[in-house]
Every structure is written in C-alpha cells, then in structure tokens.
Amino acid sequence: MKWVAVLVLAFVSRYAYAVPAVADYVFDGDTFAAYVAIAPDVDISVRVRLRNIDTPEMHGECDAEIKRANMARERLMELIPVGTVVDLQNIKDDKYLGRIDANVILPDGRDAGRVLINEKLGRPYSGGKRAGWCE
C-alpha cells in the first residue's frame, strides 16, 4: 500500500504546485512523517525526507555527530510541530520504498531544509557519497 501512495503523490505533484501535508512525527533532522490526503476522507501517512539536505545521523560515528543530529532533530521539531500544515513541493520517490523526497515549505514560506542549512544544522546534498560529520 505504501508504494501506491508514493506513486500517487509523485503523479499528483507533477500537476500540482504543492501538496499540503500535516506534520506528525520527526524521526531525525531531515526525515519526518506526515499525513497527506489522497482523496476526500482518505489520508495516508508517508515518510518525507527533506530534499537537497544532509543532516547528521542519530546513530552517528562519534559523539559530536550524535549531538549535532539531536540538535537538528529538535530544530525540525520546532519548525514543524505535530499538526503543522506544510506544503510539499518537487516530490520524488526516494531510494527507500515508502519514503518520498520533497522540498518542505513552512507556513511562513521558508524552505525547512534551507533553514537548517542556514543555521549550520545541515548541509547541501545532491546525491552520492555524503561527507562525514566527525572531525
């Protein structure tokens, strides 16, 4: 069922500028769960990864990475508390089944990923091998 939802979201996003989603649970600094309406009275829960950003891993390779990962997660929780309606733009399927990549636009119009990058809690990422967070 999850892959059907991802296909529906990817199809819809090609014809709609933004897909509204209701934030639910924040997993880490660049991934959260959200509810998306795919039909009247039909909402699905989908994992959303912020596009074009890399944040430290929660189970990182060193204490410094884990600390920064927690800071990034806490900041994303501040930006999109449970129940916040955000807009998902540029939706694409992710390498992990059941997850999508999207630009997440906050109620004030800012891009959540860009906020984290500007606050040094994440860095730009366009695919490929990621740089480490440990010195």
Predicted regions, residues:
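Small beta-barrel nucleic-acid-binding modules, primarily SNase/OB-fold domains
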Residues: 2-5, 11-135
